[in-house]
């Protein structure tokens, strides 16, 4: 009977740690989405009262990317070789 309670306790401990890990994953995803969309506005002030598109926002001839980014359907970080 003791072995049953030990096994049950270990199973509950594993289930609890798995639930905590899942909660952490969801929290990280929500934080990332908040940073990308909620806290960052689409337009950010640049020099001379112009506005630029941040990373991951769509861009075109009118909506230019911010400095250090290049437009490839959306703004991407510029990689120099």
From Swiss-Prot:
Expressed by the venom gland. SUPFAM superfamilies: omega toxin-like. Keywords: Calcium channel impairing toxin, Disulfide bond, Ion channel impairing toxin, Knottin, Neurotoxin, Potassium channel impairing toxin, Secreted, Signal, Toxin, Voltage-gated calcium channel impairing toxin, Voltage-gated potassium channel impairing toxin, Voltage-gated sodium channel impairing toxin. Disulfide bonds join 52-66, 59-71, 65-75. Residues 1-19 form the signal peptide. Its main location: secreted. It is found in: Secreted. The keyword Glycoprotein does not apply. GO terms for cellular component: extracellular region. One of its GO terms (molecular function) is potassium channel regulator activity. Residues 20-50 form a propeptide. The keyword Disulfide bond applies. The presence of a 'disulfide through disulfide knot' structurally defines this protein as a knottin. Inhibits sodium channels Nav1.1/SCN1A (IC(50)=5.7 uM), Nav1.2/SCN2A (IC(50)=12 uM), Nav1.4/SCN4A (IC(50)=4 uM), Nav1.6/SCN8A (IC(50)=6.6 uM), Nav1.7/SCN9A (IC(50)=13.6-1030 nM), potassium channels Kv11.1/KCNH2 (IC(50)=4.7 uM), as well as high-voltage-gated calcium channels Cav1.2/CACNA1C (IC(50)= nM). Also blocks mechanosensitive ion channels (also named stretch-activated channels or SACs) and the hypotonic cell swelling induced calcium increase associated with the activation of such channels. It can thus be useful in treating cardiac ventricular disturbances. Belongs to the neurotoxin 30 (phrixotoxin) family. Negative results: does not have effect on sodium channels Nav1.3/SCN3A (IC(50)=24 uM) and Nav1.5/SCN5A (IC(50)>40 uM), and potassium channels Kv1.1/KCNA1, Kv1.4/KCNA4, Kv11.2/KCNH6 and Kv11.3/KCNH7 (IC(50)>200 uM). This is Kappa-theraphotoxin-Gr2c. It comes from Grammostola rosea.
């Amino acid at each position: 009977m003791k072995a049953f309670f030990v096994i049950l306790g270990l199973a509950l401990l594993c289930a609890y740690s798995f639930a905590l890990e899942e909660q952490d994953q969801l929290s990280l995803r929500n934080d990332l989405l908040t940073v990308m969309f909620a806290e960052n506005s689409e337009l950010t002030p640049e020099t001379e009262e112009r506005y630029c598109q941040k990373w991951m926002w769509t861009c075109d001839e009118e909506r230019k990317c911010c400095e250090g980014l290049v437009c490839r359907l959306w703004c991407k970080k510029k990689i120099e070789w």
